[in-house]
Structures are given as structure tokens and as C-alpha cells.
Amino acid sequence: IDIDDEITRSYDLDWAKTPGSTLFYIKKKLEAAGYNVTFNLYNSANFGSPQIRERVVITCTKSPNPVPYLRPTHSNEEVFGLERWRTFRDAVAGLDPARCDHIDFSEKRLKYIKMLKPGENWRNLPKELQPEAMGNSYHLGGGKTGFYRRLDWDSPSPTVVTHPAMPATELAHPTENRPL
């Protein structure tokens, strides 16, 4: 059984011990059905995906021995003989840019995207422009790292979403002034 769940860095795997939490409920139901349950937080980049995508993976077995944790095949650092993370450049290598259709950013969004270098987001805009660029979102909590975000050629992509031109999930091309 493999269950994916949208998560954030604040996700706490102790929820499996917290009555009322979804993870607690799932774990208890699986254990009641006779399964030995193992779960952990995994980053897809550590398994060869050219994007940073953290997910909880639950594995179950009827065996009395728990399923071992998954072993990464890639790393952000050169350790344990693992391959380096795959990058956005790796993912798009060989694609013909002339054949890539895309939508355009609005003029307002484009104004700020043009100011960003590869790998930057709204926090890299001049301080005096940040409130104007972010509007009401400027005063909200959370990291807001998806706003005015330009990809970096030599890093994995953030989680790829269906619509890369929406304000909170923007993915701008590393060097072209357009969404993916």
C-alpha cells in the first residue's frame, strides 16, 4: 500500500501517535487488519526525480518483520557513492524550445519576474517592491516561496503543479520570461 499526502516542512510524523489525526487513523486501521506498518517522509529528489517533492510513504506487510525504509539512490551531496540529484537542466535536456507551447504571465507579474535571476523568488525583489508585488499575501503567514519563483537550471524543480502561472505556485523558466 502506498499513500501519498500533500505535506509541508511542518508536517510532524508524530501524528501517527496523535489520536484524531488522519495518519493515526490509517495506521490503527491497518494494524487492526493485521499489517505491520512502516512510514516515513521521503523527498523524491533522493530517488532520481528532478523535483523536490516531499511525501509520506506508508508501507505495510503481513510479515511480523517491518518493511525496511526505502534507500535513497541520489543525494544533494556527494556521499555514500550516491548519484547527485537530477536537475531541471537534466529534465529538459533534448527538448526543442521552439516546440514548447506556454501561456504568458500577466503584465503585472512579468514586471517582477523580469527582476529575478535563476533560483530566486519574491524575497529577492528589492525590499521596497515586495509589498506591492505580493499585495495582500505579503501580510499572510507561511513561507510564500511559490510567489514569483524562477527555476534554477542546476537544481531540482520545486513540486511541479498543473498551472505554473498561478500566483502561489509560479514556476518561471530559468532565463526566459515565461511560465513553464
Positions of predicted regions on the chain:
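Bulky hydrophobic/aromatic "packing anchor" residues in well-ordered structure
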Residues: 42, 92, 160-161
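Active-site rim elements
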Residues: 12-17, 78-82, 101, 108-113, ...
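C-terminal target-recognition/interaction regions appended to catalytic cores
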Residues: 106-180
